[in-house]
């Protein structure tokens, strides 16, 4: 969290100033990133109403976390420009997707494209990723993780070690070899198996030591990175010296002192598979079934939903549900549920879904059915985001006005 007029990031807050840890988390979901982009544009406008036109998302959150397309949004919101301010304003994000997605996910004739895409997925990734790679390198340049304007957490999965690799600004003091280019991190977290190629790169520290990374989409490990972000904060609090820790005296178990906004890219819980049908599937059907990839749909939905369920129970048990706002739409149908349908019609529809989601009632996941149900008396997501914006603004002003010791 930083002043809109200051180049300093969240880590500049002194220990006595932090009473609430503010977290923004963005799920993965391909071109459906237009949905959270639309919601974030509204949130930033609310912050600008309170603090002026220069206010940016990165000024208000101690941690911004994102997986896959959420990782791209995270990098765009927190990477510095030549004035050490966020590279993108939130209202530019959806426009960025609409402009570049057709080149990231190139599709020609629909029928021929579907056949060709299926054939490519049998022998290699559906897309070569060249446009995405060049675009990210152009936009993010040589900016490394340590230059992000606030603390950033972006999950990936290392296929050489078969374990998650989390790029966290919190860890750089102890793990300098993770200080990778934001472009490499963004390419890696969005390298969805069967859609984009795995990404390899190396880093080198000041002592000449190197580390190799063999990475794929962070959604394999944590498609909803909220819990990952909160865990990084807790680990930081435990490891850091009290006089250096930005979040002291927040105790690692005091989740009631977290203020969390978690935004999904939408899902389709109505598209179910039957055991009788799946029992007959071979490798091909698990990877490609109609316009979807069942195995990928399952692990990304499972990882995201498990986090949502866990956090719902946690904040409820601590009687601080109002500190956790999850915005997700689980009734996507047709092309809207695709991660790579970048037709103008579908992208325009995703913008409308994001706007519609703002006016839907606040909802929480039902632990029995897995569906989202309205929460009585909480109003709409638009109402809650406006309230959160006021709290974020108040917390930022309090930190700015409280004298340092």
From Swiss-Prot:
Signal peptide: none
Alphabetical GO biological process terms: defense response; lipid catabolic process
Superkingdom assignment: Eukaryota
GXGXXG, short sequence motif: residues: 28-33
Location of the active site: 68, 217
Record key words, sorted: Hydrolase, Lipid degradation, Lipid metabolism, Plant defense
Molecular functions (GO terms): monoacylglycerol lipase activity; phospholipase activity
Domain PNPLA: 24-230
E.C. number(s) listed in UniProt: 3.1.1.-
Gene3D superfamilies: Cytosolic phospholipase A2 catalytic domain
Listed CDD domains: Pat17_isozyme_like (cd07214)
Motif DGA/G per record, residues: 217-219
Motif window: GXSXG: 66-70
Pfam families cross-referenced by the UniProt entry: Patatin
Enzyme class (EC, first level): hydrolase
Function statement: Possesses non-specific lipolytic acyl hydrolase (LAH) activity. Hydrolyzes phospholipids as well as galactolipids. May play a role in disease resistance.
Xref: PANTHER family: PATATIN-LIKE PROTEIN 2 (PTHR32176:SF26), XYLOSE ISOMERASE (PTHR32176)
Family: Belongs to the patatin family.
Domain commentary: The nitrogen atoms of the two glycine residues in the GGXR motif define the oxyanion hole, and stabilize the oxyanion that forms during the nucleophilic attack by the catalytic serine during substrate cleavage.
Name listed for the protein in its UniProt record: Patatin-like protein 2
Organism per entry: Oryza sativa subsp. indica (Rice)
């Amino acid at each position: 969290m930083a002043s809109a007029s200051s180049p300093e990031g969240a880590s500049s807050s002194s220990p006595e100033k932090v009473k609430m840890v503010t977290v923004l988390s963005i799920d993965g979901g391909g071109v459906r990133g237009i949905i959270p982009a639309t919601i974030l544009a509204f949130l930033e406008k609310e912050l600008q109403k309170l603090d002026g036109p220069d206010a940016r998302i990165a000024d208000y959150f101690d941690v911004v976390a994102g997986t896959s397309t959420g990782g791209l949004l995270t990098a765009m919101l927190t990477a510095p420009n030549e004035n050490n301010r966020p590279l993108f304003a939130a209202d530019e994000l959806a426009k960025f997707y609409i402009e570049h997605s057709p080149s990231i996910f190139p599709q020609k004739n629909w029928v021929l494209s579907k056949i060709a895409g299926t054939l490519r997925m049998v022998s290699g990734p559906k897309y070569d990723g060249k446009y995405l790679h060049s675009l990210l390198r152009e936009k993010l340049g040589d900016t490394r993780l340590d230059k992000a304007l606030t603390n950033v957490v972006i999950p990936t999965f290392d296929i050489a070690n078969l374990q998650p690799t989390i790029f966290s600004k919190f860890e750089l003091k102890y793990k300098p070899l993770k200080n990778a280019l934001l472009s490499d991190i963004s390419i890696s977290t969005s390298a969805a198996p069967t859609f984009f190629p795995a990404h390899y790169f190396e880093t080198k520290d000041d002592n000449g030591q190197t580390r190799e990374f063999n990475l794929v989409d962070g959604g394999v490990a944590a498609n909803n990175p909220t819990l990952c972000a909160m865990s990084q904060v807790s680990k930081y609090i435990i490891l850091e010296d009290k006089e250096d820790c930005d979040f002291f005296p927040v105790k690692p178990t005091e989740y009631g002192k977290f203020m969390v906004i978690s935004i999904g890219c939408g899902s389709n819980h109505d598209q179910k598979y039957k055991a009788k049908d799946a029992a007959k599937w071979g490798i091909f059907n698990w990877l490609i079934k109609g316009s979807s990839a069942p195995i990928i749909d399952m692990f990304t939905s499972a990882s995201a939903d498990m986090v949502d369920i866990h956090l719902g129970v946690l904040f409820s048990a601590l009687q601080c549900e109002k500190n956790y706002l999850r915005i997700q739409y689980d009734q996507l149908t047709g092309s809207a549920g695709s991660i790579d349908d970048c037709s103008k019609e579908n992208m325009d529809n995703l913008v409308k879904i994001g706007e519609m989601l703002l006016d839907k009632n606040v909802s929480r996941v039902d632990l029995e059915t897995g569906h989202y149900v309205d929460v009585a008396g909480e109003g709409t997501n638009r109402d809650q985001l406006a309230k959160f914006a006021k709290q974020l603004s108040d917390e930022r002003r309090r930190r700015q006005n409280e004298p340092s010791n």
